[in-house]
């Protein structure tokens, strides 16, 4: 019976790790899509403002965004379900020492799920903000072009407005590049943190699996501390005796 429940727990952990790996890859691609969206709009100068469908050039990216968002939401829901099953298992497990180790593993998976959920919503919000801004700026440029073609006069005010508009677009491009660098740095830090958590978890697992080794290490540390105290006391006494002898 214990072997069956142990296999059930290992199956849940395997499912959680597989879903976490899939989510990590999806979120990296999702972040790259968000970054490339603004860059492609900047290279085009506008999203085909002369067309009656201003989203035509970005329609493929919009469809890809919607598809990836749905896939990530489904993966997050599946991972949440696996975590809930792991929580039910830990509550029904009966051995206190084993239950503590399982709770530690469950909390680590919950932290990973929380990080992925936060990163997904943040990236999605950034994408929506970029798309709205690009649509707004494309509409402004379309109005300007319509005004120029209707009047047929390139007056000074219109030229200044266009220059200011281009300047704002260049500023937005620099800001987006800075954000992309920051997001890449965050991804690297998240990956390193995951590696450190994995190492810490393995060390705890080894310590729980081999309590005799853990007890031996503790006794060695206590003996080292005791020897250090004794050595310090001997050195202190010798120093006092030398000082008394020197000043006698």
Curated annotation (Swiss-Prot):
Alphabetic keyword roster: Acetylation, Coiled coil, ER-Golgi transport, Golgi apparatus, Membrane, Phosphoprotein, Protein transport, Transmembrane, Transmembrane helix, Transport
Gene Ontology terms describing biological process: endoplasmic reticulum to Golgi vesicle-mediated transport; inter-Golgi cisterna vesicle-mediated transport; protein transport; vesicle fusion
Coarse class of the protein's main subcellular location: Golgi
Membrane topology: Single-pass type IV membrane protein
GO MF annotation list: SNAP receptor activity
Keyword ATP-binding: no
Compartments, record wording: Golgi apparatus membrane
PTM-bearing positions, type Phosphoserine: 139
One Pfam family it belongs to: V-SNARE_C
List of residues that carry N-acetylalanine: 2
Coiled-coil segments on the chain, per record: 10-30, 68-92
Chain intervals with Basic and acidic residues compositional bias: 41-50
Segments of this protein annotated with the region Disordered: 37-60
Residue ranges crossing the lipid bilayer per the database entry: 228-248
Residue numbers on the Cytoplasmic membrane side: 2-227
GO cellular component, one term: cis-Golgi network
Biological function: Involved in transport from the ER to the Golgi apparatus as well as in intra-Golgi transport. It belongs to a super-family of proteins called t-SNAREs or soluble NSF (N-ethylmaleimide-sensitive factor) attachment protein receptor. May play a protective role against hydrogen peroxide induced cytotoxicity under glutathione depleted conditions in neuronal cells by regulating the intracellular ROS levels via inhibition of p38 MAPK (MAPK11, MAPK12, MAPK13 and MAPK14). Participates in docking and fusion stage of ER to cis-Golgi transport.
Subunit structure: Component of several multiprotein Golgi SNARE complexes. Identified in a SNARE complex with BET1, STX5 and YKT6, in a SNARE complex with BET1L, STX5 and YKT6, in a SNARE complex with STX5, GOSR2, SEC22B and BET1, and in complex with STX5 and COG3. Interacts with GABARAPL2.
Family of the protein in this entry: Belongs to the GOSR1 family.
Protein name: Golgi SNAP receptor complex member 1
Organism: Pongo abelii (Sumatran orangutan)
